[in-house]
């Protein structure tokens, strides 16, 4: 319902009640997921895992980015998903250096890094996962990029725990990339909440003033992007617990095809 509709009908529906606008109340309530919500997101993540397993081998057959995106979405629907969480990202070669590239007509070729960022939607709830695969032999720089991003992502996941500031999770990832000399090539925040929307509170970044709590569901997705080499991003969706977190997205993080 729009604000104009609410104003038009409020007097008829609730003549004795004053409706007071709120700012952030619903968004705050939505941060903590109950068991039913987490169950849907767990199932959605499993569908995305299975879809990637079914399609991954196709990367070596010189498909276009758009063909891989279409096949992933078809596989998720075949497995019972209502559809993709968002427009599937398949970014190959130089396109991998653009964090939000959309799948296009470029053919995936030998030596390409391929960044695949996608998820399944089930009964309104979403998953989000990124894997990077190298087709053929990586260059020395690309291999190092992968190792650094994987280490950063693992450090970020290990930092997730109820009571931890989101900025501390961001720093856990960012410090690994900073030590490698690529801090300026980490072009975005470390993650975000996810649920009914693919991006919701809490935002996992250096500037965010929020603390993780039991039942929050967030992503951890560091990346390094170098135009002359492509890009690497690795992402998981995790459920925050009192003693750490539980990873929902479980597809292997193997670099090589």
Show which residues each predicted segment covers.
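Active-site neighborhoods and metal-handling regions in enzymes and metal-associated proteins
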Residues: 1-257
């Amino acid at each position: 319902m729009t604000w104009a509709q609410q104003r038009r009908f409020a007097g008829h529906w609730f003549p004795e009640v004053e409706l007071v606008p709120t700012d952030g109340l619903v968004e705050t309530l939505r941060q903590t997921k109950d068991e039913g919500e987490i169950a849907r997101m767990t199932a959605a993540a499993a569908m995305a895992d299975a879809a990637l397993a079914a399609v991954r081998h196709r990367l070596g057959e010189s498909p276009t980015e758009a063909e891989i995106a279409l096949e992933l979405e078809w596989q998720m629907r075949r497995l019972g998903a209502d559809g993709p969480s968002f427009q599937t990202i398949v970014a190959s070669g130089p396109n991998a250096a653009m964090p939000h590239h959309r799948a296009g007509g470029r053919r995936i070729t030998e030596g390409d890094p391929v960044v695949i960022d996608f998820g399944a939607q089930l009964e309104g709830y979403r998953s989000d996962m990124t894997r990077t695969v190298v087709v053929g032999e990586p260059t020395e720089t690309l291999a190092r990029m992968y190792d650094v991003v994987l280490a950063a992502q693992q450090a970020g996941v290990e930092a997730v725990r109820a009571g931890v500031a989101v900025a501390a999770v961001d720093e856990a990832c960012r410090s690994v990339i900073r030590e490698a000399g690529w801090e300026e090539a980490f072009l975005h925040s470390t993650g975000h909440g996810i649920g009914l929307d693919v991006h919701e509170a809490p935002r996992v970044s250096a500037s965010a003033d929020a603390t993780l709590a039991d039942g929050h569901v967030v992503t951890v997705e560091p990346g390094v992007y170098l135009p002359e080499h492509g890009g690497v991003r690795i992402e998981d969706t995790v459920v925050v617990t009192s003693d750490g977190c539980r990873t929902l997205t479980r597809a292997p993080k193997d670099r090589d095809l």
